[in-house]
Every structure is written in structure tokens, then in C-alpha cells.
Regions:
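Conserved catalytic neighborhood of penicillin-recognizing serine enzymes
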Residues: 23-88, 134, 146-178
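Structural recognition of the beta-strand scaffold that forms the well-ordered cores
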Residues: 28, 65, 75-79, 91, ...
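A penicillin-recognizing enzyme superfamily signal
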Residues: 1, 5, 115-123, 127-316, ...
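Active-site SXXK
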Residues: 4-31, 66, 124-128, 172, ...
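Repeat-associated, polar segments at repeat-unit boundaries in modular proteins
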Residues: 380, 385-391, 395-397, 439, ...
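Low-complexity, Gly/Ser/Thr/Pro-rich intrinsically disordered linker/tail segments
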Residues: 272-398
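Amphipathic, heptad-repeat alpha-helical segments
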Residues: 396-446, 467
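Mid-domain, small-residue-enriched loop/turn segments at the edges of structured enzyme/sensor domains
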Residues: 43-51, 82-123
Length: 470
């Protein structure tokens, strides 16, 4: 049986190779409906694969998040940008998988149209669990004669060799544990055992897959018809294959009375791994602009092999004064309360998204902001706030800035006071929190209603005074 294994292949052909080549769980993939260079559609044009269900586009995502949620677009982008088809195939060869089981193209490697057998998948996942060391599968261990003499010892002939670095294996196991704890493989959990694994769903519903590991065993399961008739469209690796895998693996561990143990023992430092905080958009070392991203993207802190830690600082963020009401460059007419220093995103030449700025500008702006489609920093000055001008500035009450400042400070003070007053009754606490929310809501509006905000501030102050906090 060599039916396609679906997304179960991603750790073997995409994530582990990328990390082995210098990436990290914190590296960034672009989970966006934008073409991927080298990913061709039927007409030969650059395209991208859809995520399961057709949605799930999240913009820049860490490898860890993309694997946990099994996003196809991210996996395809990682394969084509970080690994390459030929190197991905080489890793499969090192895990004992012959060419006849490999579709050596982007679709076969990133999305699992390759037809690996359950044994091959169990061995490959076992390679990761065994600190990156492949062990040739054996159907018997030895042959002895009637006198107990060993005639054949298969362990002496067994092929063993390193495929992935131990540090790579450690990180990938950690990522796969998350896929079971909170991702697509939650139904593979075994009580009192550490479990890591990956689901797979064939694109035409002809089979579903789960491959996983514990501290004791690796195993895989495929569910499908022997005539390859399509399963129910509702069948997935997560809701069908994972629970079946869980059922027989749990029985094995209980029958052998096996205690829980880590799949790979040791600590990150044992594998020369260090924690690094890169930008959540570029994957390079974070700058102040990254921490203040105007689109709300955050930095990511995760482990990296010490010999491949990024050394370059983010080349995609630039700090500018932004009007928070329009999201564009602030002008002299923007009220000071709406002006903040934020990091905007610019796509540098050579970036995987750069060549698609013209044709997919609207999509890129949706995920990366208004400035992301500018090809020159000189163009930034043309993207100024259109909400505030001389007329709107003249209409603003002279003391609006003061009430906004007072409101912001009062909200902060209220949180501090409530947090340091454990004896408040539930009703009083609820009333104060409601008053805080009212002020915050009015502060978020554009334009700000001066009269309403003034009333909300007065109410919050009264609530705090009534509670004896002011």
C-alpha cells in the first residue's frame, strides 16, 4: 500500500530539513494567498496551494505555528524558499525511502502526494525520535539453531546512520508535541505518555493518516478502502487516523506497563540551543520598530541552534510617526494623542514577496499594511493621513488632548488600584471594570466624542471614589 500520506510528510520533507539547514521554530513563513516562486499551476504560472478548507491565511507565521496548524501554504513556501525539492528528496533517501515512493515535485513533498508506506513513515518518524539517527527496520532480530547458537544476528547487519542533527531532532519533536497538545493531532493524546505526531489528509479523501511517537515507540496508521474509494468528506487525519493510532498505542503501553518518558531526553543547552527573539515578520533579529509593528505583529522567542543564530537585524521594519486613526503618516494636523511612533513594513528587493507586489498589491497590503507595496522609501512621504486637515483641526475642542490624556492615565490607574484591592466585592469590581471598558471603547473611536468621553471619565472616577480607592 502506497497511498499519499498528506500533511504527515511535512515534518520529514519541509520542517526538519529547513531546521537542519539553519532555520528555527521561530523562522517565518508567509501564509498568504500570494504566488510562491517555483510552485506552478497547470498552466505553468507561479501559484500557491490552498490551506485545508480554503481559508486559514494568517500572514507571517512562525514555523512552529504553521506546523501545529498544518497550513499548506506555509509548508509550500518553506519548501521552496528554505529547502528546495532536490534536498528534500535527499533527506527522504537518507531515511530509507526509495524513488518509487517519492513524488519528487513540490506538491509531493510539501503536501504529501508521495505514497510512502506505513512502515516507511513509522521508520522516518522514528528517525526523528532517535535523535536524528536512521535505523533500518527489521522483521526479525536473529536466528538461532537448536543448540542456541546465533546463526544470524540482524542487529550486526542493520544500517544505522545520522540523517538530522540531534539539535534538529530535538526541536522538531518539540514542535510535534505541540501539534498533539493543541494542534490538529489532539485525539492522539495518551494519558501518562508524552506523544508527538502529525496528521495527514489526502486531498481527494481517499485516505487519512497519522504518524507519531512516544518515548518508547514510533508508529503510523493509514485508513482507507482497499479499492481506494473515497472516504467521507468529513474524515480527516485528526478525527479518524489519530484516534485509531491512540487506541492501539495506548494498549501497547499499558500492556507493557511503560512509564512516561521524554521522547528525546536532555535540555536545550545539551543540544547547543539558545533562545533568540526575532521579528515576527522578517525572522531577523528584532529592532524597536518590530516591537511597535503598526499591524500588530509581535516578536517571537524560541530556540535556535547556536551555530545558526541570525546576525542581521530586521530589514523590513522602519520606524515612522503614524496617525493611529488613519494608519498613515502623521501630519501637523493630526492631534497629538493620535500620533505614535510605529514600525511599518516595507518589502526589500530579493524578498520572496517582492516580485508579486504589483499583481497582488491588495493582498499584500491586507496582511502587511499600507506601506508594504512601496518599492522605494522615497514613496513613504506620499502616504499621509487623509483624515486630519486644517478644517478638522479647527473643529477639535481645545481641551480634547487633555481629556484623552486624562482618560488614558485614569484607565491605567484604575487597573492598578483594582489589582491591589483583593477585598473588593464582586459587584464593585464588576462595576469598575464596566466603567473602564466604557472609557477604553470611547478612546478607540475615530473621531473621539469629547462629551461622551468626558462623561465616561467622570463615571469611572466616581466608581473608584465610591469604592474607597481614590
Amino acid at each position: 500500500m502506497t497511498m499519499p500520506v498528506g500533511s504527515s510528510i511535512k515534518p520529514l520533507t519541509v520542517y526538519a530539513p529547513a531546521i537542519d539547514l539553519g532555520a528555527s521554530p521561530a523562522s517565518i513563513a508567509y501564509n498568504m494567498p500570494v504566488p510562491i516562486s517555483g510552485w506552478k499551476d497547470s498552466s505553468g504560472k507561479d501559484s500557491w496551494p490552498k490551506n485545508y478548507g480554503g481559508g486559514g491565511y494568517k500572514g507571517p507565521q512562525s514555523f512552529r505555528s504553521a506546523l501545529r496548524n498544518s497550513y499548506n501554504t506555509a509548508a509550500a513556501q518553506i519548501l521552496m524558499t528554505y529547502v528546495g525539492v532536490s534536498r528534500s528528496v535527499e533527506y527522504l533517501h537518507l531515511m530509507g525511502i526509495p524513488d518509487k515512493n517519492i513524488n519528487a515535485d513540490p506538491f509531493g513533498l510539501a503536501l504529501g502526494s508521495s505514497g510512502l508506506t506505513p512502515v516507511q513513515m513509522a521508520v522516518a518518524f522514528g528517525t526523528i525520535a532517535n535523535k536524528g539517527v536512521y535505523q533500518q527496520p527489521l522483521s526479525f532480530s536473529r536466528i538461532v539453531d537448536s543448540n542456541g547458537n546465533v546463526v544470524v544476528d540482524m542487529h550486526q547487519q542493520q544500517d544505522r546512520h545520522q540523517v538530522f542533527k540531534p539539535s534538529t531532532a530535538y526541536l522538531v519533536v518539540d514542535m510535534l508535541k505541540e501539534a498533539v497538545q493543541s494542534g490538529t493531532g489532539t485525539k492522539a493524546k495518551i494519558s501518562s505518555q508524552v506523544v508527538a505526531g502529525k496528521t495527514g489528509t489526502n486531498s481527494d479523501s481517499k485516505g487519512v493518516f497519522f504518524a507519531g511517537m512516544t518515548g518508547w515507540y514510533s508508529g503510523s496508521v493509514w485508513i482507507g478502502h482497499d479499492n481506494y474509494k473515497a472516504l467521507s468528506s468529513k474524515a480527516t487525519g485528526g478525527n479518524a487516523a489519530a484516534p485509531l493510532w491512540q487506541s492501539f498505542m495506548e494498549k501497547i503501553h499499558k500492556a507493557k506497563n511503560l512509564d512516561s518518558r521524554e521522547i528525546i531526553d536532555g535540555t536545550p543547552s545539551d543540544y547547543n540551543l539558545v533562545r533568540v527573539t526575532p521579528c515576527g515578520v522578517s525572522g531577523q533579529l528584532a529592532t524597536d520598530a518590530c516591537y511597535n509593528d503598526v499591524n500588530g505583529y509581535k516578536t517571537i522567542t524560541d530556540y535556535w541552534s547556536a551555530d545558526s543564530v541570525p546576525t542581521a537585524y530586521c530589514s523590513m521594519h522602519k520606524s515612522v510617526s503614524v496617525c493611529t486613526e488613519s494608519g498613515l503618516l502623521a501630519t501637523d494636523y493630526c492631534p497629538s494623542y493620535s500620533v505614535e511612533t510605529r514600525g511599518i513594513v516595507l518589502i526589500p528587493r530579493g524578498h520572496p514577496l517582492y516580485d508579486y507586489i504589483d499583481a497582488y498589491g491588495d493582498t499584500i497590503r491586507k496582511y502587511l499594511g499600507e506601506f508594504a507595496t512601496l518599492k522605494s522609501t522615497n514613496d513613504i512621504a506620499n502616504h499621509i493621513c487623509q483624515i486630519h486637515d486644517a478644517y478638522t483641526a479647527a473643529q477639535q475642542p481645545s481641551d480634547l488632548q487633555n481629556i484623552v490624556s486624562d482618560a488614558s492615565n485614569l484607565v491605567y490607574t484604575a487597573y492598578q488600584l483594582v489589582g491591589s484591592a483583593p477585598d473588593l466585592s464582586n459587584d464593585t469590581r464588576r462595576q469598575i471594570n464596566t466603567a473602564i471598558s466604557a472609557v477604553q471603547t470611547l478612546l478607540s473611536l475615530s473621531p473621539i466624542d469629547y462629551t461622551s468621553l468626558e462623561g465616561a471619565v467622570s463615571n469611572l472616577r466616581s466608581q473608584l471614589q465610591a469604592a474607597g480607592l481614590m
